[in-house]
């Protein structure tokens, strides 16, 4: 039977040098009160120290809550994650070479928990081949002090694969909504279900402990069995939070019932995007969808595609998914990314990546930080002139882009450029601080060569033009009205792209307040 303890008591249970696993995305699933207690105990006593943290997604609110709480020199000395951008204090230690850090694909980490639980040696997959995770490139190592090899290149039946090694998990640090007296955990106020069960099983079968923070305590035998997501037999300690600020559902909201499936929100209550270059790009990306498609949308501009489809009245014709397990409804943008308004179903994190890795979705729309002439994309480690280095990691980007037949990358042509939309045209008011279309990207998060070899359809949507990967080369296929090909596109790139013989103007309606561009596509 689980023991109910305080967060301070929980912090003292974590041994020095232990490996700690967490589950969730953003603040969803994050045990904030326990994390604060760990940091406080370290400040007071110097313990626990030399921890290795393992996480499958971004954990934090890009400010002070989340994994960044543990960003104290000596507290955590090794970090493996899919996304590290939202934990500023931890990120600073990585950039200062004071913490070793591996960034691995999100789907790899969340499914590696199951391999560990089953005491299998690791995960064999093609995900990551040709990217910075491939040991022939960087092996996922994000700085110079990271020397351990977590990924091996192997051959099986004459084909190349990557082997991601299992490890011993000492502590699972999780969150739910309610725990009964036996430690059974429900998630009724959470949005995504996440991978908490798999992490708990990995810890238990490694001989470790499972700590779960909840908001409420219930009498035993009062929870519905189908509502229990982590059985009490797997839980060692329960912390009932004393501060509601430790229980935020997402980075942006304490509790949104439509994210938890406890309310269906009218579509009229979901904000419509103003006409900006972001909306133009989201509209153009939406034109690559077809009726009946199963779709994944990435963070940033890609997540705005859901709003575009909803505004046009076709949200019932497309099934949107989120990496962490949402099916249907309208995926939310930051600061609520990962949750969905009015989802039809929520499955666990790892199962969603089984679908993605097997090519189960029709279209993916993801972000673009840097691109090069070979069609490679970098979103994981890059420099923005005037703003400095950005270490973010790939999130689910590698899994999704390598396994989906049609991928649309969407992002601004230059960093921090100023544009204006007037009379159905795009006007460049001021060029950006730095070029994003480079001779060679700083880090390969997506391999154009791998995509070309596998026959994927790849498009790159910016506010100025649209590129397509044709015969392994970036090719301009559309140009925005009001844009000069030479001055506004070619002169702003570090390489010369191919120009389609059938170069078209982007639909002028994309640059107008009213747009009916999805009507024909959806068969109205």
UniProtKB/Swiss-Prot annotation:
Enzyme Commission no: 2.8.3.23
Pfam families: CoA_trans
Listed GO MF terms: CoA-transferase activity; transferase activity, transferring sulphur-containing groups
Active site: 323 (5-glutamyl coenzyme a thioester intermediate)
Keyword Transferase applies: yes
pH-dependence annotation: Optimum pH is 7.5.
Top EC group: transferase
Keywords noted in UniProt: Transferase
Domain of life, source organism: Bacteria
Induction comment: Induced by cinnamate and sinapate.
Example GO biological process: ketone body catabolic process
Catalysed reactions listed for this entry: hydrocaffeoyl-CoA + (E)-caffeate = 3-(3,4-dihydroxyphenyl)propanoate + (E)-caffeoyl-CoA
Keyword check for Disulfide bond: no
Thermal activity profile: Optimum temperature is 40 degrees Celsius.
PANTHER family, sorted: ACETATE COA-TRANSFERASE YDIF
Subunit relationships: Homodimer.
Designated name of the protein: Caffeate CoA-transferase
Gene field: carA
